[in-house]
Amino acid sequence: MTIMRKNHPLLKLINHSFIDLPTPSNISSWWNFGSLLGICLIIQILTGLFLAMHYTSDTTTAFSSVAHICRDVNYGWLIRYLHANGASMFFICLFIHVGRGIYYGSYMLLKTWNIGIXLFLTTMPTAFVGYVLPWGQMSFWGATVITNLLSAIPYIGNTLVEWIWGGFSVDKATLTRFFAFHFILPFIITALVLVHLLFLHETGSTNPSGLNSNSDKIPFHPYYTIKDLLGVLLLLMVLMILVLFFPDILGDPDNYTPANPLNTPAHIKPEWYFLFAYAILRSIPNKLGGVLALILSILILAAFPLLNSSKQHGLVYRPITQFLYWIFIANLLILTWIGGQPVEYPFTLIGQISSILYFAIIVILMPLASMIENNILKLHD
Protein backbone atom coordinates (compact mmCIF):
# COMPACT_ATOMS: atom_id res chain seq x y z
CA MET A 1 0.00 0.00 0.00
CA THR A 2 2.87 2.36 0.90
CA ILE A 3 4.51 1.78 -2.49
CA MET A 4 1.19 2.35 -4.26
CA ARG A 5 0.39 5.66 -2.55
CA LYS A 6 3.89 6.90 -3.34
CA ASN A 7 3.98 5.77 -6.97
CA HIS A 8 0.42 5.87 -8.33
CA PRO A 9 -0.02 9.20 -10.24
CA LEU A 10 -3.33 10.11 -8.54
CA LEU A 11 -2.62 8.68 -5.08
CA LYS A 12 0.82 10.34 -5.13
CA LEU A 13 -0.91 13.72 -5.38
CA ILE A 14 -3.15 12.94 -2.37
CA ASN A 15 -0.16 11.50 -0.50
CA HIS A 16 1.91 14.68 -0.95
CA SER A 17 -1.04 16.85 0.14
CA PHE A 18 -2.59 14.98 3.07
CA ILE A 19 -0.40 12.06 4.21
CA ASP A 20 3.37 12.59 3.87
CA LEU A 21 3.12 16.40 3.79
CA PRO A 22 5.91 17.83 6.01
CA THR A 23 4.11 20.04 8.56
CA PRO A 24 5.53 22.27 11.34
CA SER A 25 5.37 20.36 14.64
CA ASN A 26 4.04 23.33 16.61
CA ILE A 27 1.01 24.59 14.66
CA SER A 28 -1.95 25.24 16.98
CA SER A 29 -5.69 24.71 16.59
CA TRP A 30 -5.93 28.05 14.74
CA TRP A 31 -4.52 26.13 11.75
CA ASN A 32 -7.53 23.75 11.83
CA PHE A 33 -9.87 26.18 10.10
CA GLY A 34 -8.52 25.54 6.61
CA SER A 35 -9.62 21.90 6.79
CA LEU A 36 -12.91 22.96 8.42
CA LEU A 37 -13.55 25.26 5.45
CA GLY A 38 -13.00 22.27 3.17
CA ILE A 39 -15.59 20.27 5.15
CA CYS A 40 -18.02 23.22 5.04
CA LEU A 41 -17.59 23.45 1.25
CA ILE A 42 -18.31 19.72 0.85
CA ILE A 43 -21.43 20.01 3.09
CA GLN A 44 -22.65 23.04 1.10
CA ILE A 45 -22.14 21.38 -2.30
CA LEU A 46 -23.86 18.13 -1.23
CA THR A 47 -26.85 19.75 0.52
CA GLY A 48 -27.11 22.30 -2.31
CA LEU A 49 -27.23 19.52 -4.89
CA PHE A 50 -30.15 17.82 -3.12
CA LEU A 51 -31.96 21.15 -2.69
CA ALA A 52 -31.51 21.93 -6.40
CA MET A 53 -33.30 18.66 -7.24
CA HIS A 54 -36.52 20.02 -5.68
CA TYR A 55 -36.16 23.79 -6.16
CA THR A 56 -37.78 25.73 -9.02
CA SER A 57 -36.22 29.05 -10.06
CA ASP A 58 -39.46 30.75 -11.05
CA THR A 59 -40.89 33.77 -9.22
CA THR A 60 -44.34 32.17 -8.93
CA THR A 61 -43.15 28.85 -7.48
CA ALA A 62 -39.73 29.52 -5.82
CA PHE A 63 -41.14 30.31 -2.36
CA SER A 64 -43.60 27.39 -2.56
CA SER A 65 -40.85 24.99 -3.68
CA VAL A 66 -38.78 25.84 -0.58
CA ALA A 67 -41.88 25.27 1.59
CA HIS A 68 -42.43 21.97 -0.26
CA ILE A 69 -38.81 20.92 0.45
CA CYS A 70 -39.33 21.60 4.18
CA ARG A 71 -42.77 19.94 4.43
CA ASP A 72 -42.93 17.10 1.91
CA VAL A 73 -39.41 15.98 0.95
CA ASN A 74 -37.85 13.29 3.17
CA TYR A 75 -35.56 15.14 5.59
CA GLY A 76 -35.95 18.21 3.35
CA TRP A 77 -36.12 20.48 6.41
CA LEU A 78 -32.79 19.03 7.59
CA ILE A 79 -31.10 19.53 4.20
CA ARG A 80 -32.46 23.09 3.89
CA TYR A 81 -31.34 24.14 7.39
CA LEU A 82 -27.98 22.39 7.04
CA HIS A 83 -27.43 24.44 3.89
CA ALA A 84 -28.58 27.75 5.42
CA ASN A 85 -26.67 27.35 8.70
CA GLY A 86 -23.77 25.65 6.92
CA ALA A 87 -23.22 28.98 5.14
CA SER A 88 -22.99 30.72 8.52
CA MET A 89 -20.47 28.14 9.78
CA PHE A 90 -18.55 28.59 6.51
CA PHE A 91 -18.22 32.34 7.10
CA ILE A 92 -17.35 31.93 10.80
CA CYS A 93 -14.50 29.59 9.79
CA LEU A 94 -13.54 31.96 6.95
CA PHE A 95 -13.28 35.00 9.25
CA ILE A 96 -11.23 33.05 11.82
CA HIS A 97 -8.99 31.67 9.02
CA VAL A 98 -8.31 35.18 7.67
CA GLY A 99 -7.89 36.56 11.20
CA ARG A 100 -5.30 33.87 11.96
CA GLY A 101 -3.52 34.73 8.70
CA ILE A 102 -3.28 38.38 9.78
CA TYR A 103 -2.18 37.56 13.35
CA TYR A 104 0.54 35.07 12.41
CA GLY A 105 1.78 36.91 9.31
CA SER A 106 0.61 34.29 6.79
CA TYR A 107 0.07 37.13 4.30
CA MET A 108 3.79 37.00 3.56
CA LEU A 109 3.10 33.83 1.53
CA LEU A 110 1.98 36.13 -1.28
CA LYS A 111 0.57 33.66 -3.81
CA THR A 112 -1.43 31.73 -1.21
CA TRP A 113 -2.72 34.96 0.37
CA ASN A 114 -3.82 36.49 -2.95
CA ILE A 115 -5.64 33.32 -4.03
CA GLY A 116 -7.28 33.38 -0.58
CA ILE A 117 -8.54 36.93 -1.24
CA UNK A 118 -9.93 35.76 -4.58
CA LEU A 119 -11.65 32.89 -2.74
CA PHE A 120 -13.19 35.35 -0.26
CA LEU A 121 -14.35 37.56 -3.15
CA THR A 122 -15.94 34.53 -4.87
CA THR A 123 -17.62 33.22 -1.71
CA MET A 124 -19.36 36.55 -1.03
CA PRO A 125 -21.39 36.75 -4.29
CA THR A 126 -22.11 33.00 -4.00
CA ALA A 127 -23.72 33.53 -0.58
CA PHE A 128 -25.51 36.68 -1.79
CA VAL A 129 -27.15 35.05 -4.84
CA GLY A 130 -28.03 32.05 -2.65
CA TYR A 131 -29.86 34.33 -0.20
CA VAL A 132 -32.06 35.56 -3.07
CA LEU A 133 -33.28 32.07 -4.07
CA PRO A 134 -35.97 31.40 -1.38
CA TRP A 135 -37.75 34.50 -2.81
CA GLY A 136 -38.91 35.86 0.53
CA GLN A 137 -39.25 39.58 1.32
CA MET A 138 -35.63 40.01 2.42
CA SER A 139 -34.42 37.96 -0.58
CA PHE A 140 -36.22 40.25 -3.01
CA TRP A 141 -35.40 43.57 -1.37
CA GLY A 142 -31.82 42.52 -0.57
CA ALA A 143 -31.34 41.67 -4.25
CA THR A 144 -32.90 44.99 -5.30
CA VAL A 145 -30.81 47.14 -2.95
CA ILE A 146 -27.46 45.39 -3.44
CA THR A 147 -27.67 45.09 -7.25
CA ASN A 148 -28.78 48.74 -7.37
CA LEU A 149 -25.40 49.73 -5.92
CA LEU A 150 -23.85 49.04 -9.34
CA SER A 151 -25.80 52.02 -10.70
CA ALA A 152 -23.25 54.19 -8.83
CA ILE A 153 -20.65 53.25 -11.48
CA PRO A 154 -20.33 56.31 -13.75
CA TYR A 155 -21.64 56.14 -17.33
CA ILE A 156 -22.33 52.36 -17.51
CA GLY A 157 -24.00 51.92 -14.08
CA ASN A 158 -27.69 51.92 -15.04
CA THR A 159 -27.12 49.75 -18.13
CA LEU A 160 -25.11 47.30 -16.02
CA VAL A 161 -27.89 46.99 -13.41
CA GLU A 162 -30.55 46.32 -16.07
CA TRP A 163 -28.20 43.82 -17.71
CA ILE A 164 -27.79 41.92 -14.41
CA TRP A 165 -31.55 42.09 -13.71
CA GLY A 166 -32.43 40.93 -17.22
CA GLY A 167 -35.14 43.60 -17.30
CA PHE A 168 -36.21 46.80 -15.56
CA SER A 169 -36.59 45.28 -12.08
CA VAL A 170 -35.64 42.19 -10.07
CA ASP A 171 -37.91 39.56 -11.62
CA LYS A 172 -38.07 36.04 -13.11
CA ALA A 173 -34.97 36.54 -15.30
CA THR A 174 -32.97 37.71 -12.25
CA LEU A 175 -34.00 34.71 -10.14
CA THR A 176 -33.18 32.23 -12.93
CA ARG A 177 -29.69 33.63 -13.53
CA PHE A 178 -28.99 33.91 -9.79
CA PHE A 179 -29.82 30.21 -9.46
CA ALA A 180 -27.42 29.46 -12.33
CA PHE A 181 -24.68 31.56 -10.66
CA HIS A 182 -25.33 29.91 -7.29
CA PHE A 183 -24.95 26.48 -8.86
CA ILE A 184 -21.72 27.16 -10.79
CA LEU A 185 -19.78 29.36 -8.31
CA PRO A 186 -19.11 26.64 -5.67
CA PHE A 187 -17.30 24.59 -8.33
CA ILE A 188 -15.18 27.65 -9.22
CA ILE A 189 -14.49 27.99 -5.46
CA THR A 190 -13.42 24.31 -5.36
CA ALA A 191 -10.98 24.90 -8.24
CA LEU A 192 -9.55 27.97 -6.46
CA VAL A 193 -9.20 25.93 -3.24
CA LEU A 194 -7.00 23.44 -5.11
CA VAL A 195 -4.82 26.31 -6.42
CA HIS A 196 -4.73 27.76 -2.87
CA LEU A 197 -3.46 24.40 -1.54
CA LEU A 198 -1.00 24.04 -4.41
CA PHE A 199 0.64 27.40 -3.58
CA LEU A 200 0.57 26.65 0.16
CA HIS A 201 2.37 23.33 -0.32
CA GLU A 202 5.01 25.04 -2.49
CA THR A 203 6.22 27.10 0.48
CA GLY A 204 4.93 25.09 3.44
CA SER A 205 2.78 26.38 6.27
CA THR A 206 3.68 29.17 8.70
CA ASN A 207 3.74 28.41 12.44
CA PRO A 208 2.91 30.29 15.69
CA SER A 209 6.54 31.19 16.50
CA GLY A 210 7.02 32.98 13.17
CA LEU A 211 10.40 31.26 12.76
CA ASN A 212 11.55 28.98 9.95
CA SER A 213 10.36 25.46 10.79
CA ASN A 214 12.18 23.49 8.06
CA SER A 215 14.37 21.81 10.68
CA ASP A 216 11.36 20.57 12.67
CA LYS A 217 8.70 19.00 10.44
CA ILE A 218 6.42 16.01 11.07
CA PRO A 219 4.20 14.08 8.63
CA PHE A 220 0.63 15.37 8.31
CA HIS A 221 -0.80 11.88 8.89
CA PRO A 222 -1.49 10.69 11.60
CA TYR A 223 -0.72 13.77 13.73
CA TYR A 224 -2.78 16.44 12.02
CA THR A 225 -5.42 14.14 10.50
CA ILE A 226 -6.45 13.25 14.08
CA LYS A 227 -6.25 16.89 15.16
CA ASP A 228 -8.37 17.98 12.18
CA LEU A 229 -10.86 15.19 12.88
CA LEU A 230 -11.46 16.63 16.37
CA GLY A 231 -12.09 20.05 14.77
CA VAL A 232 -14.51 18.51 12.27
CA LEU A 233 -16.47 16.75 15.05
CA LEU A 234 -16.72 20.00 17.04
CA LEU A 235 -17.82 21.89 13.91
CA LEU A 236 -20.49 19.27 13.14
CA MET A 237 -21.66 19.37 16.75
CA VAL A 238 -22.12 23.17 16.67
CA LEU A 239 -23.78 22.96 13.24
CA MET A 240 -26.22 20.24 14.39
CA ILE A 241 -27.10 22.20 17.55
CA LEU A 242 -27.85 25.20 15.31
CA VAL A 243 -29.86 23.15 12.80
CA LEU A 244 -31.86 21.06 15.29
CA PHE A 245 -32.48 23.59 18.07
CA PHE A 246 -32.12 27.12 16.65
CA PRO A 247 -32.50 26.78 12.84
CA ASP A 248 -33.79 30.34 12.31
CA ILE A 249 -31.65 32.23 14.81
CA LEU A 250 -29.29 33.61 12.14
CA GLY A 251 -31.98 34.18 9.50
CA ASP A 252 -34.47 37.01 9.03
CA PRO A 253 -38.17 36.56 9.94
CA ASP A 254 -39.09 38.70 6.89
CA ASN A 255 -37.90 35.88 4.65
CA TYR A 256 -40.88 33.77 5.72
CA THR A 257 -43.11 36.26 3.89
CA PRO A 258 -43.27 35.73 0.09
CA ALA A 259 -41.58 38.47 -1.98
CA ASN A 260 -43.84 41.46 -2.59
CA PRO A 261 -42.54 44.32 -4.78
CA LEU A 262 -45.30 46.62 -3.44
CA ASN A 263 -44.36 46.29 0.23
CA THR A 264 -40.92 47.32 1.51
CA PRO A 265 -39.65 45.79 4.81
CA ALA A 266 -38.88 48.29 7.61
CA HIS A 267 -35.17 47.45 7.66
CA ILE A 268 -33.50 45.94 4.61
CA LYS A 269 -30.32 44.12 5.60
CA PRO A 270 -28.19 41.27 4.22
CA GLU A 271 -27.20 38.10 6.09
CA TRP A 272 -25.20 38.64 9.31
CA TYR A 273 -21.83 37.82 7.70
CA PHE A 274 -22.10 40.82 5.34
CA LEU A 275 -23.24 43.32 7.98
CA PHE A 276 -19.72 44.72 8.64
CA ALA A 277 -19.32 45.60 4.94
CA TYR A 278 -22.93 46.88 4.81
CA ALA A 279 -22.22 49.19 7.78
CA ILE A 280 -19.14 50.60 5.99
CA LEU A 281 -21.25 51.10 2.83
CA ARG A 282 -23.97 52.97 4.76
CA SER A 283 -21.57 55.16 6.73
CA ILE A 284 -20.63 57.16 3.61
CA PRO A 285 -23.39 59.56 2.46
CA ASN A 286 -22.27 59.43 -1.19
CA LYS A 287 -23.44 56.37 -3.19
CA LEU A 288 -20.26 55.89 -5.26
CA GLY A 289 -18.07 56.55 -2.20
CA GLY A 290 -20.01 53.93 -0.25
CA VAL A 291 -19.60 51.32 -2.98
CA LEU A 292 -15.84 52.03 -3.21
CA ALA A 293 -15.51 51.75 0.59
CA LEU A 294 -17.42 48.45 0.46
CA ILE A 295 -15.05 47.01 -2.17
CA LEU A 296 -11.98 48.40 -0.37
CA SER A 297 -13.08 46.85 2.95
CA ILE A 298 -12.28 43.44 1.39
CA LEU A 299 -9.48 44.44 -1.02
CA ILE A 300 -7.59 46.07 1.87
CA LEU A 301 -6.50 42.51 2.76
CA ALA A 302 -4.20 42.66 -0.28
CA ALA A 303 -2.43 45.65 1.31
CA PHE A 304 -1.17 43.69 4.35
CA PRO A 305 2.01 42.38 2.65
CA LEU A 306 2.72 45.87 1.21
CA LEU A 307 2.22 47.69 4.53
CA ASN A 308 4.23 45.20 6.58
CA SER A 309 7.37 46.98 7.83
CA SER A 310 8.07 44.74 10.83
CA LYS A 311 11.28 42.74 11.07
CA GLN A 312 9.37 39.97 12.87
CA HIS A 313 6.98 37.42 11.40
CA GLY A 314 3.51 37.58 12.96
CA LEU A 315 2.34 39.40 16.10
CA VAL A 316 3.40 36.88 18.77
CA TYR A 317 6.23 39.06 20.14
CA ARG A 318 4.76 42.44 19.17
CA PRO A 319 2.54 43.73 22.03
CA ILE A 320 1.68 47.14 20.49
CA THR A 321 0.47 45.67 17.18
CA GLN A 322 -1.26 42.88 19.14
CA PHE A 323 -3.25 45.50 21.04
CA LEU A 324 -4.23 47.18 17.74
CA TYR A 325 -5.19 43.79 16.27
CA TRP A 326 -7.69 43.09 19.06
CA ILE A 327 -9.09 46.62 18.76
CA PHE A 328 -9.54 45.87 15.05
CA ILE A 329 -11.45 42.63 15.86
CA ALA A 330 -13.65 44.44 18.41
CA ASN A 331 -14.27 47.20 15.84
CA LEU A 332 -15.29 44.56 13.28
CA LEU A 333 -17.85 43.16 15.74
CA ILE A 334 -19.19 46.70 16.35
CA LEU A 335 -19.54 47.20 12.57
CA THR A 336 -21.44 43.88 12.34
CA TRP A 337 -23.83 45.08 15.07
CA ILE A 338 -24.28 48.52 13.44
CA GLY A 339 -25.04 46.93 10.04
CA GLY A 340 -28.14 45.33 11.55
CA GLN A 341 -29.41 48.55 13.18
CA PRO A 342 -31.74 51.16 11.61
CA VAL A 343 -30.21 54.23 9.91
CA GLU A 344 -30.62 56.75 12.74
CA TYR A 345 -28.64 58.51 15.46
CA PRO A 346 -26.51 57.26 17.28
CA PHE A 347 -26.00 54.19 15.02
CA THR A 348 -24.93 56.25 11.99
CA LEU A 349 -22.28 58.09 14.03
CA ILE A 350 -20.94 54.87 15.60
CA GLY A 351 -20.84 53.33 12.10
CA GLN A 352 -18.85 56.27 10.69
CA ILE A 353 -16.33 56.22 13.56
CA SER A 354 -15.92 52.42 13.26
CA SER A 355 -15.50 52.63 9.47
CA ILE A 356 -12.74 55.25 9.80
CA LEU A 357 -11.09 53.15 12.51
CA TYR A 358 -11.33 49.98 10.34
CA PHE A 359 -9.16 51.54 7.61
CA ALA A 360 -6.99 53.65 9.95
CA ILE A 361 -5.83 50.62 11.97
CA ILE A 362 -4.72 48.72 8.86
CA VAL A 363 -3.25 51.58 6.81
CA ILE A 364 -1.83 53.94 9.47
CA LEU A 365 -1.69 52.54 13.01
CA MET A 366 -0.35 49.01 12.40
CA PRO A 367 2.58 50.10 10.14
CA LEU A 368 3.36 52.87 12.67
CA ALA A 369 3.34 50.36 15.54
CA SER A 370 5.68 48.09 13.54
CA MET A 371 8.18 50.93 13.10
CA ILE A 372 8.03 51.77 16.83
CA GLU A 373 8.61 48.09 17.74
CA ASN A 374 11.54 47.85 15.31
CA ASN A 375 13.09 50.90 17.00
CA ILE A 376 12.50 49.63 20.54
CA LEU A 377 14.07 46.26 19.72
CA LYS A 378 16.82 47.88 17.63
CA LEU A 379 15.83 45.76 14.63
CA HIS A 380 17.37 47.69 11.76
CA ASP A 381 18.53 46.59 8.31
Curated annotation (Swiss-Prot):
Q: Name one GO cellular component term.
A: mitochondrial inner membrane
Q: Name one GO molecular function term.
A: ubiquinol-cytochrome-c reductase activity
Q: Where does heme b b566 bind?
A: H97, H196
A GO BP entry is: mitochondrial electron transport, ubiquinol to cytochrome c
Locate the coiled-coil region(s) and give their ranges.
Answer: none
Hey, what's the signal peptide range on this chain? none
Cofactor remark: Binds 2 heme b groups non-covalently.
Looking at the UniProt entry, the stretches that span the membrane are 33-53, 77-98, 113-133, 178-198, 226-246, 288-308, 320-340, 347-367
Record localization: Mitochondrion inner membrane
One family name in Pfam for this protein:
Cytochrom_B_C
Please tell me whether the keyword Nucleus is annotated for this protein.
Answer: no
Q: Where does a ubiquinone bind?
A: H201
Q: How does it sit in the membrane?
A: Multi-pass membrane protein
Recite the UniProt keywords alphabetically. Electron transport, Heme, Iron, Membrane, Metal-binding, Mitochondrion, Mitochondrion inner membrane, Respiratory chain, Transmembrane, Transmembrane helix, Transport, Ubiquinone
Q: Where does heme b b562 bind?
A: H83, H182
* Organism domain of life: Eukaryota
Q: Which cofactor does it need?
A: heme b
Main localisation, per the record? mitochondrion
Q: What does this protein do?
A: Component of the ubiquinol-cytochrome c reductase complex (complex III or cytochrome b-c1 complex) that is part of the mitochondrial respiratory chain. The b-c1 complex mediates electron transfer from ubiquinol to cytochrome c. Contributes to the generation of a proton gradient across the mitochondrial membrane that is then used for ATP synthesis.
**Subunit structure, interactors included:** The cytochrome bc1 complex contains 11 subunits: 3 respiratory subunits (MT-CYB, CYC1 and UQCRFS1), 2 core proteins (UQCRC1 and UQCRC2) and 6 low-molecular weight proteins (UQCRH/QCR6, UQCRB/QCR7, UQCRQ/QCR8, UQCR10/QCR9, UQCR11/QCR10 and a cleavage product of UQCRFS1). This cytochrome bc1 complex then forms a dimer.
What the record says about family reads:
Belongs to the cytochrome b family.
Which PANTHER family does the entry mention? CYTOCHROME B (PTHR19271:SF16)
Q: What is this protein called?
A: Cytochrome b
